[in-house]
Amino acid sequence: WGGNVTFDDFCEYILPYRIGDEPLSLWRKDLYDTYNPLLDKFRKSADSNDIIKAAQILMDTLRQGKYRYTSLFPKGPHIGPVALKWKTGSCREFADAMIYVMRALGVPCGMDRVIQRGDTNASHFWNFILDKDRNTYMAEFPYQENWKKASEYDITKGKVYRVTYSLNEELTKELKDVPSVHPIFRYPFFHDVTATYLGQQNGQIVIPQKELYDCPRTGELVYLCFANKQEWVPVACTFFDGKAVCFDNVEGGIVAILATYNEKGLQTLSNPFTLNHDTGEIHYLNPLQESHIISVYKKFYFAVKNYFNTRMIGGVIEGSNQKDFQNVDTLLLIKEAPYRLYTVAYLNPDRAYRYIRYRGGKGSYCNIAELSFYENSLDTLPMKGKIIGTPGCYGDDGRREYTNVFDGNPDTSFDYKFPDTGWAGLDLGKSYRVSKAIYTPRNDVSFIYKDNIYELFYWDKGCWNSLGRQTAVADSLVYTVPQNALLYLKNHTTGNDAVSYTHLRAHETKA
């Protein structure tokens, strides 16, 4: 496959002796000697010029290890080739590990990233490789089984950049006369590859001057910013042409704001706005004088595609009088993703059952956090029984077994090791008519919790404005808020100003 790699790609995605700022080490020969034998048979096959197949062989082997995700690694230099040995870290460390192996074996591989996701409070990194026609294939190692085309990657990305060893000379030249450039763009070792991932979903943002409450000078650099908690993070930049601010190659499904940058930091120019993923329509979040009453169930709305709560769609609650559930009755089919901490379902069974369970839908990994059953619809104490289910969880570390479903803790969950056939239930000892079930989806501890203290804010002309604090008496809050406002909910009980569970989103609440 080496004959299909261009010289430029070789110099950028194979030759570099380091990914970024990691400590120097002599890693290439050791990794070549370790992983090269895996490709001996492949080199003799008819497909030996297929880069994707070579990369798949290597990834299949790398995925056999047990990896542990953690976001606790401090921000700073890359850790280097030890990422392969430790098998612990965030998406950045996992992407680094893949790059070292691929480059050692002559596969053009690198890292694509989003500086800030447009629908959740995180940046993200993943791997890419280039086929013989320079088409991009991507993988979220170690979770993704196969390399897939960039256009098939379906998370909300907003803007995508390819990390490079060389400086982006074109962008550097454009910014050389700007007196104060935001640190993210000051030394741009990256290129914009958003169009590679979006295809026909590639959008454009045009914000006319009339939507700016603080108009920049003609030719002044303006940043497109996405939200991270109470901060705004630049993800793209352009120059104001005197009439409008225009950004090409932006994916919809995001909340953004415009800002300039100087020695005092970011200075916002507009109120927030959304870009519709399907239509490309821009909606401005300018708070109105009119207010309305809303109920808040979660600290951010479920904009993230394939979020945990959606995995409950298609799940069923079943009853049986046989331990193996050979003869089973469906008591409830979950048709919608739950949006609150506790969802109550009334079952109205025709008969009594000794065994009752939740069985996850196809591809759900039986993701569920908590489940309780009640003999009568007015009961408040759940039924007791022997916990039964399918053993085994992702990572085989025992942290997300089926027993979590009945531990009374909505912050723990079941994550079955296979996408299908997982279930968790109770042996009640004898047959009962079960009239009610209450369930909680797997989650990131962002629901509303009783007795926690919350504060709701809305954004208007450059700052967050408080709508007051409340102590939750159930799994929801009620607020009167300005219509058409961007809202932000902060938990003062479990969070702190630095790493609080706070999320900024538009229309995240249910009226």
Segments predicted by a language model, with ranges:
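Disordered, acidic Ser/Thr/Pro-rich linker "stalks" and the adjacent N-terminal cap
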Residues: L288-T343, N348-A352, G363-V434, T440-Y449, ...
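A short, amphipathic beta-strand motif
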Residues: G203-Y213, T502
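Short, acidic Ser/Thr/Gly-rich low-complexity loop/linker segments typical of extracellular
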Residues: K229-K243
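Short Pro-Gly-centered beta-turn/loop motif in secreted/extracellular proteins
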Residues: A244-A256, Y261-E263
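Linear, non-domain "peripheral" regions
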Residues: W1-S48, N271-F273, G360-K362, S500-R505
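Short, ordered, surface-exposed loop/turn motifs in non-cytosolic proteins
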Residues: L212-Q230, T310-G315
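Structured interaction patches on ligand/partner-binding surfaces of diverse proteins
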Residues: N262-Q289, L504
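Hydrophobic/aromatic-rich core segments of domains that either
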Residues: D40-T61, L72-P81, W86-K87, R92-I184
